Swiss-Prot record:
GO molecular function, one term: N-succinylarginine dihydrolase activity
Binding site for substrate: 19-28, 110, 137-138, 214, 252, 363
Classification lineage: Bacteria, Pseudomonadati, Pseudomonadota, Gammaproteobacteria, Alteromonadales
GO biological process, one term: arginine catabolic process to succinate
Cross-referenced PANTHER family: N-SUCCINYLARGININE DIHYDROLASE
Active site per UniProt: 174, 250, 369 (nucleophile)
EC numbers on record: 3.5.3.23
SUPFAM superfamilies from the UniProt entry: Pentein
Entry's family note: Belongs to the succinylarginine dihydrolase family.
Protein name per UniProt: N-succinylarginine dihydrolase
Pathway(s) where this gene product acts: Amino-acid degradation; L-arginine degradation via AST pathway; L-glutamate and succinate from L-arginine: step 2/5
Species whose genome carries this gene: Shewanella woodyi (strain ATCC 51908 / MS32)
Function in brief: Catalyzes the hydrolysis of N(2)-succinylarginine into N(2)-succinylornithine, ammonia and CO(2).
């Protein structure tokens, strides 16, 4: 049996826009109200996904959310025709309309937490959609996310799907952006790292003062229980609250791991050495490569601006590891110098590949945000909805679909355009047929 890690990237939706919705996310906030290019954004994401497939990686795509989300606008009291609802919301509650048009589901690192069958008690691959309760615009995603995941991983013999955690701040859960799995080989039992920003039930525990901590210890522990993980293969690490206050809203902005490598910034965690000792002890006899980036070489500001740690580390078919980085890392002198040095240090990371994902970066997410990691074996891969897996035919078809349905310019004011509803629903209805997803959206019910 073969084992590997698949990446399922979020397909950028037709309403990709810069509304500046995410307090604590420096890039999102600083680009608020800029004019976006949904067509370019979608094509940049598809190009990155296809490039990884061409490298020999298993690569899938996850469908975007339905936006504008008129179902939520109706839930909060707006009524009338679709056009009337948009018009009323734009006039009476523009911030709520922007939230209901969010493009953030493209960042599937926040879609769910995934535990592979090698780690779980029942030997199934487990998925729990993130509840994303800290941000209104993301808190409306989990039900549809669950539908899309169930339509993608649609075999109960191999996959177990859980409901998202209770919608309360005590269980704030941001998905795989705060979860890393280390292992010797993808088919071996690994060590699952859950990184949290605060303890909801302990008012005396450290927490940030300026920006919110979006992941709680209690949420991480609940997911470990749901997924049937043992104490022997879980480690809980506290994020450094000071770096959260400097714009590190998720752990994947300050650390990233793959197999026996944890690549992290010097200031990423609290109680670092004790926690790393625990990781190594639970990992076993093989060595974990803890690759620390010193503050003296890369500041927190440069790490956040460039998204040095919001890169993907992948294991190529050759066995070498490579970093998939945004071109922003090339454009930052300190970060580019560090990455050039990194590949000479004798670690498992041997190369860096750069991709232009600026439309995503300007909205606050880099290459790692765009993908959900799923370690699996070939039997499980055969049980996945094959129409969601990247190949030449799907790449061609999805690019043609984007050309047909997406605008190349979208401002925040355009979100009130009733035509956008028709365009978006027409596109998504066709997409569910391309990817054979069935009726996953509210408008299809």
């Amino acid at each position: 049996m073969k084992h590997f890690e698949a990446n399922f990237d979020g397909l950028v939706g037709p309403t990709h826009n810069y509304a500046g919705l995410s307090f604590g996310n420096v890039a999102s906030f600083s680009n608020a109200s800029a004019v976006s290019d949904p067509k370019s954004a979608a094509k940049q994401g598809l190009k990155k996904a296809k490039a990884l497939a061409d490298m020999g990686m298993v690569q899938g795509m996850l469908a975007p959310q339905e936006r504008p989300d008129l179902h939520t606008l109706r839930r909060i009291g707006f009524s009338g025709t679709d056009a009337e609802i948009l018009n009323k919301a734009a006039k009476e509650a523009p911030a709520l309309l922007r939230a209901c048009c969010s493009a953030s589901s493209m960042w599937t690192a926040n879609a769910a937490t995934v535990s592979p069958s090698a780690d779980t008690q029942d030997g199934k691959l487990h998925f729990t959609p993130a509840n994303l309760v800290d941000k209104l615009h993301r808190s409306i995603e989990p039900v549809t996310t669950g539908n899309i995941l169930a339509a993608t991983f649609n075999n109960s013999r191999h996959f177990s799907h859980h409901q998202h955690l209770p919608e309360h701040s005590s269980f704030g859960d941001e998905g795989a952006a705060n979860h890393t799995r280390l292992c010797e080989n993808y088919g071996n039992a690994g060590v699952e790292l859950f990184v949290y920003g605060q303890e909801a039930t302990n008012p005396n525990a450290p927490k940030p003062q300026k920006y919110p901590a979006r992941q709680t210890l209690e949420a991480s522990q609940a997911i470990a229980r749901l997924h049937g993980l043992s104490e022997e293969n879980t480690v809980y690490l506290s994020q450094n609250p000071d770096v959260i206050d400097q714009g590190v809203f998720h752990n994947d902005v300050i650390a990233v791991g793959n197999q026996n490598v944890l690549f992290y910034h010097q200031q990423a965690f609290l109680d670092t050495q004790n926690k790393f000792d625990e990781i190594q002890q639970k990992f076993g006899d093989s060595k974990v490569h803890f690759i620390e980036v010193p503050t003296a070489k890369v500041s927190i500001e440069d790490a956040v601006k460039s998204y040095l740690f919001n890169t993907q580390i992948i294991t190529l078919p050759s066995g070498e590891m490579a970093i998939i980085a945004p071109t922003n890392c090339q454009e930052n002198p300190a970060v580019f110098a560090y990455l050039n040095e990194l590949v000479t240090l004798g670690t498992p990371i041997k190369q860096v590949n750069y991709f232009d994902v600026k439309q995503s970066m300007q909205n606050g997410g880099g290459p790692a945000c765009l993908r959900l990691r799923v370690a699996m074996n070939d039997m499980e891969l055969a049980a996945v909805n094959q129409n969601t897996l990247m190949n030449d035919a799907l790449f061609t078809r999805l690019n043609a679909w984007v050309d047909k349905h997406y605008r190349d310019r979208l401002s925040v004011d355009d979100l009130a355009d009733p035509q956008l509803i028709i365009e978006s629903r027409t596109a998504l209805d066709e997409l569910t047929q391309i990817m054979k997803l069935g009726s996953v959206y509210q408008f299809q019910k």
